[in-house]
Regions:
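N-terminal signal-anchor module of multipass membrane proteins
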Residues: 1-72, 324-333
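C-terminal ends of transmembrane helices
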Residues: 6-13, 66-80, 113-124, 188-199, ...
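Hydrophobic, membrane-inserted alpha-helices
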Residues: 29-33, 63, 67, 87-96, ...
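Structural signature of hydrophobic alpha-helical transmembrane segments
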Residues: 48-62, 100-109, 170-185, 224-238
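A generic, well-ordered mixed alpha/beta core segment in the N-terminal half of proteins
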Residues: 83-152
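Long hydrophobic alpha-helical segments that form multi-pass transmembrane helix bundles
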Residues: 122-192
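Loop-to-transmembrane alpha-helix initiation sites
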Residues: 125-130, 229-238, 258-261, 276-289, ...
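Central hydrophobic cores of alpha-helical transmembrane segments
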Residues: 130-135, 204-213, 259-268, 287-290
Length: 333
């Protein structure tokens, strides 16, 4: 008699399916970069556009060189594969968008760290870039080059009004379309594209963003800062990183029930960290989720799928945690 076992794993139908997922993300990132350039040209930000193009080209060249060296070490000599079956272009675009005006040595180190993580942790793909971005942000912090709206608001103990917030970034257009913080509008458009192409685990993205939105909206009401939710969603590259790194297909939950819980839990963590270490909040949250939480949820995924009582209980606990989080943030900040 054949014995059956329950396997908590992510299954991809074929190697071709994996390539399709990578291709969809790559296409969307190319469109994102092109639209960012076009929008900033229309806004008259020519200097920023040149800096962005330079950053992307440098990132692509450096990533290609080191990826090819890795291929040589592995005794693979198919250069075409680097761009057609690997995440080289996608990783280059993400790092390039994050490293505008960054020192080339730091850019190179960030790429090396990204590729190192990607190759030692075989299941990680696009989210490996988080480790490189982490290095870039830490460098900016220690060189006093991290004067972003998030850090300025924190340094002012979150006591700023709507007009002061707009002045930080020279108007609302730079929040919505600005090159420095990765346009939330374009991020939403790319999410719609990936959702349409069935290339993203939308349950995770929606539950994550919805959790953060609820917490920030209620915090804004209780502290007389109705603008707070829009500020949080449009800064710190929150939407961009959520769409491109939160749902890495091999290291994020696969079943709908666990995906929703995953998004809610990480949303609570991010909301708290936005008040403590704002620029690193999303990065640290996603890394934590991939290293610890995702594996645990996958281990209990079968129980959650077929034991609705347990699943509903966990959802209720999550809602209680959201309320507690709002109360604590309102009292402290």
């Amino acid at each position: 008699m054949r014995e059956f076992h329950i396997a908590n794993k992510t299954y991809v139908k074929s190697h071709n399916s994996t390539n399709k997922i990578i291709a969809r993300y790559t296409y969307s990132l190319i469109i994102f970069a092109l639209l960012t350039i076009i929008i900033n040209l229309l806004l008259g930000n020519k200097t920023q556009v040149l800096s962005l193009i330079k950053s992307i080209l440098l990132s692509l060249i450096i990533t290609s060189v080191f990826t090819y060296l890795i291929y040589i070490i592995k005794k693979e000599y198919n250069i075409k594969k680097i761009y057609t079956e690997d995440t080289t272009i996608a990783l280059s675009l993400i790092i390039g968008l994050f490293s505008v005006n960054i020192d080339i040595i730091i850019l190179t180190l960030a790429i090396i760290v990204t590729l190192f993580i990607k190759n030692i942790k075989k299941d990680i793909n696009l989210s490996s870039v988080l480790y490189g971005i982490l290095l870039i942000i830490i460098y900016k912090y220690f060189t006093n080059n991290l004067d972003t709206p998030l850090t300025i608001l924190k340094n002012n103990s979150f006591n700023m009004n709507y007009n002061e917030i707009l002045d930080i970034n020279n108007g609302i257009y730079n929040y919505l379309f600005g090159i420095n913080y990765l346009s939330p509008i374009l991020s939403i458009i790319m999410f719609i594209y990936l959702f349409h192409k069935k290339g993203i685990k939308y349950n995770i993205v929606i539950s994550y963003i919805l959790t953060i939105s609820i917490i920030m909206f209620l915090y804004g009401i209780f502290t007389d800062k109705m603008w707070f939710i829009l500020f949080e969603l449009s800064t710190g590259s929150l939407l961009f990183l959520t769409i491109y790194t939160l749902t890495d297909y091999k290291v994020s939950p696969t079943i709908g029930e666990t995906q929703i819980l995953y998004g809610i839990i990480l949303g609570i963590i991010t909301s708290i960290l936005r008040f403590i270490i704002p620029e690193l909040s999303v990065i640290i949250t996603i890394i934590f989720g991939e290293l610890l939480l995702s594996k645990y949820l996958d281990n209990i995924s079968y129980k959650l799928k077929y034991n609705k009582k347990l699943y509903n209980s966990l959802i209720i606990i999550s809602m209680i945690l959201i309320i507690i989080t709002i109360v604590i943030l309102t009292i402290i900040y």
